[in-house]
Regions:
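Low-complexity, Ser/Thr/Pro/Gly-enriched N-terminal "stalk/linker" regions
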Residues: 16-102, 124-150, 186
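Catalytic cores of eukaryotic secretory-pathway lumenal/extracellular enzymes that build
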Residues: 174, 199, 203, 208-210, ...
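C-terminal beta-rich recognition modules with glycine/proline-rich loops and embedded aromatic residues
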Residues: 34, 242, 292, 357-366, ...
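Carbohydrate-binding/catalytic loop surfaces
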Residues: 63-96, 145-164, 213-229, 256-278, ...
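A conserved hydrophobic secondary-structure block that centers on an alpha-helix together
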Residues: 151-232
């Protein structure tokens, strides 16, 4: 199915609406809708997510907005048996103070799928939901369009406890913004125009009576949405709102060089960086970019992380380099994975530094994929890393955790983080089967990448490889141009690459310069093919505070042992001698199944599989590694 999709908004030319000073952006996003995800594990995860979005009942998605607007749905005026009521439960239940948060995530995810896939059926459903939100807004007096009552914000001003009302409203605003950005739904923007008038008054009242209230109720995402709306409309009232949310204490502490994260709620702090990113884009003030870099320093560089990229336990930042002390059942909240990937993607665009793309790659496999059930699309709130763990999956209508919402968004993010451009290049940042159709250096280009992953032997493309070896990192690319066009294609060399990448251009082996972690190939393109092999090897990544414990990693992919306890690994300094590939798949049938391994030369033989393939099995990630045995 397909439908004509408007270009929407692309942030390639931010300086056009910036009246302050020049914004330096090293890498530009490609246009919405220019990237199509091709068959493979990422496409499969997008598809199961799309099925779930369509499966959910629109009335249930809107239930809390209806209740707030005084609309009673048939069958819900009197409920005799709650178990049979057609209603969403968990955090969406009408008695929960976070009720209604999920719909904003749903709208955002739907909008991005519509933009990337031209999904007409999903667009009809999304447009209908937005129309109903406009109806609710009218019944509420023309401004408020909340799933929660306005009085929750009065409680913030009065310093009375209430569970994160700004978090809830941020999701609604975010979803409506994305509906306008990605699909051109002007009704969504109209709703926001009127809702923002309510916020102008509320923040003004708060500033006069209790300025702290603006920074209460988990408000971290608010700065981004108001700054983004200023980008979209150039309406000064949104800039006013952005400025009212721009003086968070986190920013002051970061500028002072203080660790403002340790033992604090992780996901309540990460979205501040997204707001800083938008403020950098609308002001050009490099101080905002510096704040983002300082955040990354305290969150990642100086803190360390699990091999899966997790940096938190029980929702709180783990103290620097003490990850081993916090291994348990509540590691790596998924919301933090998603939001850190967004932070990394901003920093990648602004700086061009490869480290952020490497981080994103690892988070995709060990967060986005590992924390989504491949069958149902459901998330796991945390990613347990203790020995003998099992993932706890959410249900389709009875949980609706925060991570439930970020997961449906996460599975639509892939088209935005694979390709970038600058004035002369197409940059390939992630290796996900996909097709890009757009403009590079003034030329119309179609670029496609697929994986050559399969069992290969001495007849394989690289005949010097050992017999019986398997790799997913044999990558194939095709380039087609409307005319003969000279430009550069830059390919990220992953941080885990061992030795020199091996390259063929149009069937001929070539060498290419590597600069700042990228292979740069400049050619006169018309119709061309490329193949690149990134050599990798198994390695053990040890915990800084418990170096006796380590995770087995293959490229960017964390492996899990199918065992209920830490049985130890002898000879951990030479894992290639302790693990043998488990040739259990037919790669023509499962072209994106990652390698499985089985230990050898060990007291106990253990199967290892990618953590993202684990569903209901018991597993162990960190093992005692003994060198030289």
């Amino acid at each position: 199915m397909s439908t004509e999709i408007p270009d929407g908004i692309c942030y390639n030319n931010i300086t056009e609406i910036n009246d302050f000073c020049e914004v330096i952006i090293m890498l530009n996003n490609v246009k919405n809708g220019s990237v199509k995800i091709l068959p493979g594990v990422f496409r499969e995860r997008m598809d199961v997510n799309r099925r779930y979005l369509m499966e959910l009942d629109a009335n249930c998605l809107l239930q809390n907005f209806y209740l707030e607007a005084g609309i009673i749905l048939p069958g819900l005026q009197v409920v005799d048996d709650p178990t049979t009521a057609n209603i969403h439960w968990g955090w969406e239940a009408p008695v929960c103070q976070l009720r209604g948060h999920f719909l904003g995530h749903w709208i955002s995810a739907a909008a991005k799928l519509i933009a990337s896939d031209g999904d007409a059926e999903l667009k009809v459903k999304m447009d209908g939901i937005i129309s109903e939100l406009a109806r609710c807004q009218e019944l509420n007096g023309g401004e408020w369009v909340g799933s929660i009552p306005e009085k929750y914000f009065t409680r913030l001003i009065n310093n009375q406890y209430i569970w994160s009302p700004q978090y809830v409203m941020h999701k609604t605003i975010m979803g409506l913004s994305d509906a306008y950005i990605y699909t051109g739904n002007t009704q969504a923007l109209d709703i926001l125009v009127h809702l923002s008038d309510w916020y102008i008054r509320w923040t003004g009242r708060a500033a006069e009576t209790n300025p702290h209230a603006v920074y209460a109720g988990e408000e971290a995402g608010m700065l981004e949405v108001w700054a983004q709306l200023y980008q979209l409309t150039n309406d000064e009232k949104y800039l006013t709102l952005a400025k009212r949310y721009a003086d968070a204490g986190l920013f002051r502490k970061l500028r002072e060089g203080r660790d403002s994260l340790t033992n604090c709620h992780a996901n309540a702090s990460i979205p501040f960086t997204h707001g800083a990113a938008r403020m950098y884009e609308i002001t050009g003030d490099s101080d905002w970019l510096e704040v983002m870099k300082l955040f990354w320093k305290f969150a990642v560089t100086d803190r360390g992380m699990y091999s899966t990229t997790g940096m938190n336990a029980g929702e709180f930042w783990v103290p620097p380099h003490l990850q081993g002390h916090f291994i348990g059942s509540n590691d790596q909240e998924f919301c933090t994975v998603y939001n850190m990937v967004r932070t990394a993607s901003f920093l990648l665009r602004y700086t061009g530094e490869k480290q952020y793309a490497d981080y994103i790659e690892r988070a995709l496999y060990n967060g986005f994929l590992a924390q989504q059930n491949a069958d149902t699309g459901m998330p796991t709130y945390f990613l347990p890393l203790a020995a003998g763990s099992r993932k706890k999956w959410g249900t389709k209508t009875r949980d609706f955790w925060c991570c439930h919402g970020t997961m449906v968004q996460a599975q639509t993010l892939y088209p935005e983080i694979i390709y970038y451009t600058d004035s002369e290049r197409l940059i390939v940042s992630q290796y996900i089967p996909s097709r890009f159709e757009g403009e590079v250096s003034g030329h119309s280009v179609t670029f496609e990448q697929t994986t050559g992953m399969k069992y290969y032997n001495d007849q394989a493309f690289f005949d010097e490889k050992d017999d019986g070896q398997m790799s997913r990192w044999l990558l194939k690319f095709s380039v087609k141009c409307a005319d003969n066009a000279k430009f550069t294609i830059s390919f990220r060399v992953p941080e885990w690459t061992v030795g020199a990448p091996e390259i063929e251009l149009n069937g001929e082996k070539i060498t290419a310069r590597v600069e700042d972690g990228y292979i740069n190939i400049t050619a006169d393109w018309s119709d061309g093919t490329l193949q690149i092999f990134f050599p990798s090897e198994l390695r053990m990544e040890r915990l800084p505070d418990m170096p006796e414990l380590g995770a087995v990693v293959d490229g960017p992919i964390v492996l899990a042992g199918l065992i209920s306890a830490d049985c130890g690994i002898k000879g951990a300094d030479k894992l290639s001698e302790q693990f043998m590939p488990q040739l259990e798949h037919t790669y023509g049938t499962f072209p994106w199944r990652q390698n499985s391994w089985r230990t050898r030369n060990q007291p106990q033989s253990v199967m290892f599989r990618p953590l993202y393939e684990i569903r209901d099995e018991e597993y162990t990630v960190y093992f005692t590694g003994k060198d030289g045995e």
